Amino acid sequence: MKDKIIEILKEETKGQSINDINKNLHLKSMEDINMLEDTLNEMTTEGILHKSKNHEYMLLENTKSLKVGKLRINKSGNGFVECKPEDIFVHSNDLNGAINGDFVEVEIKTRLNDPEPEGYIRNILKRDLKKVVGEIVKDKKTLGFKPDDEKLNIAVKLTKESLKGCVEGHKVIIDIIKEIGNRTFLAKVEKIIGHKNDPGVDILTIAAKHSIETEFSEAVKEELKNIPDEVSEADLIGRTDLTNEMIFTIDGDDTKDIDDAISVEHTGKNYKLGVHIADVSNYVKVGTNLYESAFSRGTSSYLADTVIPMIPHQLSNGICSLNPEVVRLTISCVMTIDGNGKVIDYDIFPSYIKSRKQMTYKNVNKILDENIIPEGYEPFADTLKTMHELADILRKEKISRGYIDFGIDEDKIIQDKNGKAIDIVKRVQGTGEKLIEDFMIAANETVATHISNMDLPFIYRVHDLPNAEKIEDFTNLIKQMGYQVHTNLNKITPVTMQKLLNEFRDKDEFVILSDMLLRSMKKAIYSTNNIGHFGLASKNYTHFTSPIRRFPDLTVHRLLRTYLFENRIDMETINFNAKYLIDVAEHSSETEVNAIEAERDVLDMKMAEYMMDHIGEEYTGIISGVTNFGLFVELDNLVEGLVHISTLNGYFTYIPEMLSLISFDKKTKYRVGDKVKVVVTNANKEGAIVDFELVRDTNGNSK
């Protein structure tokens, strides 16, 4: 019936009543008419139709100003409706009773093609509020519940039975039973995460808030019992023996789930690069609970020092991990690369290896940067230097075609044994880290190119062209801020974006400007539609190299086995993959964003926790953002805090087109990129808040 309704309304630009629609359907029985009404309401909830106050229906796509999507509310109380091609901003005054996570219909107030369209919530189509994370609090003489998410402006009444075992301060997950009033819900406690003062509960609470599963089901645990701890002789049949090759791994000091190993030979003018990836698909097979669990999670989550794996540690740290001096099953991509960094030949095949050594970035960087050879690395020093040569060649080739290096630093939180943040250090991408990145990109491109040439259904990692208007807005903004732009932006290509970024690379405020440009661009996603990867300047790109921690990589391995190793390219297989991979791509993109948001929330919380011990201390920072309510300042350790406008000396006006605050007498101006000195005045772990004030001299002037 839905298809018939869509056909009827396809050409209609005005709303149609049920009777109007039924004139074309010729339904006569009351039962059929009731079914029609139910179908129309269902299609409205799904966002296919718009229903007016007069109960008239039209296709949503035929309306000029209506869109549907999930509402995401940020800390400021404002929201964004996730729509294609652009998210729509919704001011807190225009939410119309909608809460974070609602599926809504939004009416656009500005033009649809505006760089940042704005709208208001017209209808709440679906409220998918099932579970909420929060804290058990004292409510007079009884126990109550307070959601951790302040954006969820709701009241909750808990059933008495479910409160058994709960005490004040417990972090819990509740199940919503039903809505019993406007934004008021009856619920029950589903799970006690732990007491808020217990080590690690803060991180597990954020994981729960993002619906990240921290435990595996009994069904998964049962399947694990049938997976061996060692590779058998039978497993080696049909695989190429690479155990005599000089193959090793390079990872962080504390890495336990090792899924990539490398090898290299310099043969005349060319290099032979081997990238050998753990064959997780040999153990996590379609149709198993392990596979379904991996699909559901989509990715491993790295929350400070807590790893929540996509597959159980028994596999990720065991038989799937390329540990040294043990035989492991792999899928190898061996490439012949010329002196210009071009792949001139390659082979992709099932293999087995025995890693010679588990190396660390720290020790590899000593060899490559300082020519110091740590103990135990002597047999590998020459090979590492050859790898360095090849990595330099590959990087130069990437840069020549427009590879964009945003140079964004990342933080690492150091915690004590009780899980308290005691230090923040920058993750430095040294020579070894860049080497591995270059090798993995080469393998990912080679695998993607091969399947693309076969014209078979596949899952790609894609990055669309940036919106020209957003790039123009960025350049106009930085010009207003006083920066000169020499790059010709008439045609936006990776090379022009690279040139634009390089104009600021030597400036102190480069990281801030780079981040602003990055936010002007679209996000990389997974897709079956191969549009290339703009940021990498790649025509074909996929994720092949991390099947332990990313479901798309696991899927790519399964497809390689199907298409290349088993030669199953029949129409049934092709048709199945064509449909199934769309779901994999969409779900994987969603779980990736969710994991990144959880990681960001943990980082913000731990930064605030760290700064609680540094209230009253002075720091130098750079203004990273300017709003009508103050300045955001980023310190050298990447902690960002707010200097509220009320703490500034005098009256200031916000100039949005210049991202500046200017004093009433025009003598003082604060803009993005300015260096300032601040003092920490407040830090709150629960709210993930850090507040600063500008440091002043004896005359009241900021330094």
Question: Model regions: which residues?
Answer:
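Charge-lined substrate channels and their catalytic hotspots, especially those that engage the 3′ end
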Residues: 1-272, 281-327, 358, 366, ...
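Electropositive polyanion-binding surfaces
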Residues: 23, 163, 173, 179, ...
